[in-house]
Amino acid sequence: MTRLHNPLTVIAGLTRDPLRNRDTSSRLGDGGSLSAMTVKSVSVSFLVIVCLLFSSCAKKQDPVESLLSKMTLEEKCGQLACPIGFNFYGKDGDSLWVADDFLGMMDTLPLGSCWAVLRADPWSKKTVETGLHPLESARLLNMMQRHAVENTRLGIPMLFCEETPHGHMAVGTTVFPTGIGQASTWDPALLEQMGVVMGREVRLQGAHIGYGPVLDIARDPRWSRVEETMGEDSFLSGTLGAAIVQGMQKNVCATLKHLAAYGIPQGGHNAATAEVGPNRLMTDYLPSFEKAIVAGGAKTVMTSYNTIDGVPCSASGWLLQEVLRNSWDFKGVVFSDLNAVNAIYATQHVAVDPAEAAALALKVGVDIDLGGYNYGGFLKEALQRGLVTEADIDRAVRHVLQLKYDLGLFDNPYVDEALAESEVGTAESAQLAKQVALESAVLLKNDGILPFGENIKKVAVIGPNADNMYNQLGDYTAPQDPDRVVTMIEGIRDKGRAEVTYAKGCAVRDENDADIEEAVRIAKAADAVVLVVGGSSARDFKTSYEETGAAIVDEHLSDMDCGEGYDRSTLKLLGKQEELMQRIYAIGKPVVTVYIQGRPLDMNFAAEQSNALLTLWYPGMEGGSALADILWGDYNPAGRLPISIPRSVGQVPVYYSQPQTGDYVEESAKPLFPFGYGLSYTQFEYSDLQIEPAKAMSFQRGNVRGRESMADTLCKVSFTIKNIGLCDGDEVVQLYVRDEVASVTPASKLLKGFQRIHINKGESQQVTFYLTERDLSVYSKEKGWHVEPGDFTIMVGGCSDVNNGDAMKSKIQRS
């Protein structure tokens, strides 16, 4: 097991003894009492002491087992319940206190963990004013932790869990681009740095577990949570996810979400069933989790709400035991998603009552019930009814206690509150958020209008997402101080390169068109237009929410068209946005269209009519400053799509690796913009592709128990890339493999390597990839992962559409 860096080596804290109430007499008796020994010579005494030390070491009980043996059934059940915590405190001005709800719960069922104490958003009803700022957060969690340590029988410290999909979801923290934007960077090193910041901000405030990254493979853009994912490909998602995990786990535990196949729900409905067989699961939807566990060292995993072929993921022994524990050798803690254990009974109807639901989840390996309802309220009943054994309960408790020991919580469970005030949400962290936003921007079209030249002296900025900070931040975002967020219009104005005018034009969803005429007026007077459209995952305090926190679509009309619970039946821009676009394009001025979006929306009209087209996804707190740098050429965009942009919703699902098919009657079967696509202000040329057998060597990219031979390198792929354009820039080099004939229908191609590299104009660089047996393997239920003899086509280029002129191909044969 890879041991976490002890967070207390990073954050100095108070020193307490959480085990002070334990009976230590048994430990003293393990090796005998030195004071009772009578020793008559130095040599003999030395021998006796050495013998005693060895005897003590041999007999010393594992601390987890020692503690477990002292626990009552109620105390064990408490370790497995993780209730929602944002109502566990009160705040009035500078006064802060632990709520009676928490104290009462600890009296009846001493909790092992708590979720979302620091969460602030409309669901929690916490605002910038009523929520907790970093110093208050650290104070509160120290207070709650102190109560657990000093006022419960065994003094077991708690785990505090927080949401961290693109920054800690709390007031005053750093807000990065959402997952789909992070994936557009194709930059593992950058995302590891981001993970360090996210984990550090969580730990500085007293929490220990960050929920994220989200590694669901998203292949249905109607689904409301595409924005949280790393896109459609498991190799890209797993590589980037492992990097984020490694960054986060320098300070906290990362939680991989959501195991498994949550991103392909029937009809695009959140939490709907996934109809997929074991072969496709293993090849398409599970490798991202495997890589983040095996290569990234992830310590915790969260199950998903959905069923797979009718079996709830939180009740799947095949998924949580055979695959997760046995095949991937996972040793950590498994959380359910919020109320997912109860869903086994309440909505999936696989259990007759909450106690049976608790039993089903516990027996297959769900260690902690997020929400706590079933394990906290019904696990004891399940034991009494013979649905579980105490050994089943002990197994889960053992996992939880071991994680607490690994985190160092029994040595020091507290944090230095002053550091939270000074080191959360820093200017340096904001600069990193800007860098992620810059690298995530994908240029989809450019007829030469970008970057803006000296002739662009007056710019009209128009659109519903041009000056709305929450629309650019995405779901799972806390309320913000406006001074900490740079909107699109603010970034452009702050650039100071042109006179700037602004009109909203319309809202994202509202049908009011009263402001369109003003938008047309300022567009006519400008040298160029920046038209900022798209969607929004901005929650507000009028929206209704389910018990899980998912938004409920109702008659209330906000800008929100995306985010958990907001599934779509079309991908069209809503409200009057298309009318606004038509009116602006008809003027004939140069138009740069910018999409702020959480899912791939319909871009056909914009791609046809715009002079330039960008997607920034949800770019986070520095999105406006990033856009301005790109518009004026201070940064050369090089983001690449991690998900295909469909031409219409009728193509869905459309993804790069699906077996080739014929066209539709109405349109091409190809996406509007393919996976891996993105333009630059410069051009690159590929040449000199060489493939040669590599010397046998261990290659640590996915050693899985029983399959260590898969780590052997089979061949080396090298080629040269040259920047033949007029400016320096990044290129994302992509390597794809196609198995020409296999016992299971092969994908049309699969990504097996990528590098984001910077090349100065006129310069060349040699790029090398190593392909392993796993890269060329096929999975079958009967044989597992194995390489079959035959031909493989190797393709390299700047996009998954490797039939373009920039791509190179070659074949290798495996005998």
Over which residues does each language-model region extend?
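Long, compositionally biased low-complexity repeat segments characteristic
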Residues: 3-11
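A cross-taxon signal for low-complexity, glycine/charged-rich
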Residues: 3, 16-43, 47-48, 701-704, ...
